[in-house]
Design a protein with these regions (language model features):
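Active-site loop-to-helix "anion-binding N-cap" substructures in soluble metabolic enzymes
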Residues: 1-279
Length: 279
């Protein structure tokens, strides 16, 4: 590692630890030095839509990707890079390592957690499943590797409906974890026999139907897109329900110029890049 890059990394650590404000020119210089180091180390950054917009742009500049958790891991498997810097919560790093065991997977911190993951303890969930041995166990990607190991199927929000419909066609009764709202949405959409684990996303669980109704009154021409981790009362008011990637596609293709978005604020950054003419 050359001296300039080493100094830049030390500066970046100091900025992060002490929350020191930086000028735009300093930020560009730091970014370029870190990108040079990443090229030396054959590393790319993969990050989730929910992280800060500056980090999303950095990931793209590194030759990496901004995506949902599954696409992050799939990209990691396909890329020629030897090291994956996964910017997201812990289960995303685990998923990337599962799909690319031969690659080095680095995360900025292992303390970045997801309430769905934390709210589904592997030991407790295993006991829950053992009480219902006749049921097929389906878990959401937003779980630890230990929880995934107890499951028959692992799904993402983009493929969950298709998988549940298939299992229903076989006559399966299902245990779904960890998100009770997503599980409720799947049960209502497919009519499958689903027993839900009592978990929720702390971000989406805060969305309230009455607040959404007030927004719709203020902006009646706006389309409403929400994530299926939202409460049922919010989902019922939406024009479109889908995964983060599907929400972006909907916004790009919609005739509506104004969109009310029901998910983490980080997704707005990519939506504005893909559909800058919309609000």
């Amino acid at each position: 590692m050359n001296i300039n890059i080493e100094k830049s990394l030390e500066k970046a650590r100091e900025i992060n630890q002490k929350r020191i404000p930086v000028s735009p020119s300093e930020l560009v210089s730091l970014k370029n030095d870190i990108l040079d180091l990443m090229r030396e180390e054959k590393a790319v950054m993969v990050c989730h839509y929910y992280v800060d917009g500056v980090i999303q742009d950095f990931a793209v500049d590194s030759g990496g990707i901004v995506a949902d958790s599954l696409e992050m891991a799939k990209f990691g498997k396909k890329t020629a890079a030897e090291t994956l810097i996964v910017v997201g919560v812990r289960f995303m790093g685990e998923t990337a390592k599962i799909l690319s065991p031969e690659k080095k997977v680095i995360m900025p911190t292992l303390k970045a957690t997801c309430s769905l993951d934390v709210g589904c303890d592997a030991g407790l969930f295993k006991k829950f499943c053992e009480k219902n041995p006749e049921k097929t166990v389906v878990v959401y990607a937003n779980t630890s590797a230990a929880v995934k190991a107890t499951a028959d199927w692992t799904v993402t929000s983009s493929c969950a409906v298709k998988i549940i419909e298939y299992l229903k066609s076989r006559g399966d009764k299902i245990i779904f974890a960890p998100d009770k709202h997503l599980g409720g949405y799947l049960k209502k959409t497919t009519g499958a026999d689903i027993t839900n684990w009592d978990g929720h996303c702390v971000v989406h669980d805060e969305f309230k139907a009455f607040e959404l109704m007030q927004l719709k009154k203020r902006i009646p021409e706006a389309s409403v897109v929400v994530h299926p981790e939202s409460p049922a009362s919010v989902i019922d008011l939406a024009d479109f329900v889908g995964s983060t990637s599907d929400m972006i596609k909907y916004v790009m293709q919609s005739d509506s110029k104004k969109i009310i978005v029901g998910t983490d604020n980080g997704l707005i950054h990519m939506m504005k890049k893909k559909a800058p003419e919309k609000i």
